[in-house]
Amino acid sequence: SSELVDQMVESGEEPSLGGQETGITAFFSDVQAFSSFSELLTPTGLVDLMNEYLTAMTNILQEERGTLDKYIGDAIVAMYGAPIPMDDHAYQSVRTAILMQKRQIELREKWSYEEEKWGKCHGLVSKMQTRIGCNTGTATVGNMGALDRFNYTMMGDMVNLAARCESGAKAYGAYIMITEETKLASQQTKDDIAFRYLDKIVVKGRKEAVAMFEPTGFMADLNQETQDCLDCFKQGIDKYLKQDWDGALSMFEKAKELEPNKPGVTPGVVDNPSMILINRCNVMKENP
């Protein structure tokens, strides 16, 4: 980034290998069912699609002061809070995730009119969805690699957890999933984002369960239906945690009708958090 270049010029430092521990928020995004795009699109079509998608997403990332770590195919790996320190790195990462999802709605709308361009893949392209995961904590950041060829990147347990948030979001029917650490840090900066509690999960390699949340959007953008959905869902979670399966089912059924993402309505969506919790309640009822 231009800020990083300015910082290097001012300090007079040459880039060199090495890392330091820094408080950051790690950000991972991944296109849902990307292998389908690879199989069905021509190589040129795939490159065109990815370039348009990655340009749109990276523009948002940079506008929100994120640092691009790398692209891995369709995936974006980024960090907030390094190399330029930021007090609001958690908030900026969540804000980026929400803005990316909003931008993808616009892209799907645009692609839905480009039937000639995408041919037999038109239906697939116009249903593209992205999952995003974020986690906040201390990571090792710096230049890593070979002596003559290295990359500014991040490493550590908290980075792995951010990646797990992204991949694990699928199990909850969510398209953004963040840790409680990120939620709390984000709210300390600015409390204008709505969140819903999803679950506590024990991640492989960790002993303690981590609370996971879905940012559902900016409060100012939420319609009454979505607000009611979040209220019903929260009541469902409260009853679920008390093992009141019937009470929880009742609330999740109400929330399901109000979900902002519905299969058959929202392109590319096959389930949502309410549907996942309904299934889980039914399993608990049958296997007390």
Show the residue positions of the predicted features.
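A generic structural signal for short hydrophobic patches within well-formed alpha-helices
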Residues: V5, F34, T182-K183
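Catalytic core of nucleotidyl cyclases, primarily class III adenylyl/guanylyl cyclases
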Residues: I60-Q92, E106-D157, E181, Q187, ...
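Cytosolic regulatory/linker segments at or just downstream of nucleotide-handling modules
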Residues: Q129, A139, G168-D238, K242-G247, ...
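Regulatory cytosolic signal-relay segments
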Residues: S1-E21, I105, K110, P267-G268
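Serine endopeptidase catalytic core focused on the charge-relay Asp
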Residues: M100
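Catalytic NTP-binding/metal-coordinating core of nucleotidyl cyclase/transferase enzymes
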Residues: E13-T96, R149-Y152
